[in-house]
Curated annotation (Swiss-Prot):
It comes from Mycobacterium marinum (strain ATCC BAA-535 / M). GO terms for biological process: tricarboxylic acid cycle. Keywords: FAD, Flavoprotein, Oxidoreductase, Tricarboxylic acid cycle. This is Probable malate:quinone oxidoreductase. It catalyses: (S)-malate + a quinone = a quinol + oxaloacetate. InterPro entries: FAD/NAD-bd_sf (IPR036188), MQO (IPR006231). It is an enzyme of class 1 (oxidoreductase). The lineage of its organism: Bacteria, Bacillati, Actinomycetota, Actinomycetes, Mycobacteriales. Transmembrane segments: none annotated. It holds the Pfam family Mqo. Gene3D superfamilies: D-Amino Acid Oxidase, subunit A, domain 2 (3.30.9.10), FAD/NAD(P)-binding domain (3.50.50.60).
Amino acid sequence: MSESARTDVVLVGAGIMSATLGAMLRRLEPDWSITLIERLDAVAAESSGPWNNAGTGHSALCELNYTPQRPDGSIDISKAVRINEEFQVTRQFWAYAAENGILNDVRSFLNPLPHVSFVHGAERVHQLRRRRDALAGNPLFAGAEWIDDPDEFARRLPLMAAKRVFSEPIALNWAADGTDVDFGALSRQLIGYCVRNGAVALFGQEVRNLVRQPDGGWMLTVVNRRTGEKRKLKTKFVFVGAGGNALSLLQRSGIKEINGFAGFPIGGRFLRTANPALTAAHRAKVYGVPAPGAPPLGALHLDLRYVNGKSWLMFGPFAGWSPKFLKRGHLRDLPGSIKPNNILSMVGVGVTQVTLLNYLIGQLRLSEPDRVAVLRKFVPSAADSDWELIVAGQRVQVIRRDKRKGGVLEFGTTVVGEADGSIAGLLGGSPGASTAVPIMLEVLQRCFTHRYQSWLPALKEMVPSLGANLSEEPVLYDEVRSWSSRALQLDAS
């Protein structure tokens, strides 16, 4: 890159979000110059890496926090439907990418795997049945099986049944059409496609500053983290897909839209094993009920994972805490993000989130034997020697200004950008990776309003259901579901 290079598009961060946007833009505008800048030395080395997230491919098939109970006792399925719709959109893009040479090794990142909700105790069994009944009429959730017989439980989940005393009611809601997703492998394929088709990927380089230019573009200061060399890069559009680092970069840009936003980092830890006897006895992702005070991403689950062709089991998450906004970030990340325009937002959250803080304190006090004791609620026969503790990625949850409370803590993803569309970034975490395509469609529509209409025919090739609500169009859902299953090799297993 020259001393003052130019490029049409800059993507900051080499995770699933930048990878998705880059691949979409390369299809829409093959002549545009695209430069990807990553501070680390590899693709998907932070939150998109397979050991930095659970790989569920969130589709709300098993995550109980997406179907809360209303005060009158009824079940609110609206969030589950929305998240599943978003995942179907992402799945369609993956199918299109597989058919058009963007993705060439589907099994390296996507494998069929049942998604299962697990509860015990009469009251929770009753609640799970009401959840199942509420979802049963929606085509997105059709076909789920109800299992409350201990013998069938043991046949489906032998590892969880071993040494279990079935002294109270248990129940499973079994969705056979779930998946396990390695977002790291997926990111590498998408970015590989971009680079093969003219994009430039810079690794070990960090964006330190963004300055608005008189012509509406941006001048970026890029620093080589190995040599300290500084370079300038001018661009028309910046996407900040830098995970936890997005907040600080958007703050440095000076756009007014970031005012009032803050971030609260929550780390994750998991127990992991590759013992073949254990992985062979658990072929599902099984989600339990979130603990009191736990954030939505804190529901315990026992997952089979496929990483680099090998089977693993992963149990957690157990919360950790660090002021870093990235797993390989800086201790100054959190204090450095506190500004006059967001300090009231942070104070407001500190006052109102006492339950969450107590949950985090309790999690930080857990010893290794304590964590294995929690694991035994899922795997009664678990032996300490089979499991190792790993540190997963950091999630920076969004704190947004609120007139009444000062600030509110949000769990999810938020697109923040300049009104003129010249810069946009993504804040927040779960279920971000698996809803990457709807989020990038939002970025395209918000940031390229003058081109979006002309892009629609191509976008509808990528996502045939674009503009439709699949939950209200069962025939269309069946069509795109069957097509994507074939393209993604999900109907042959």
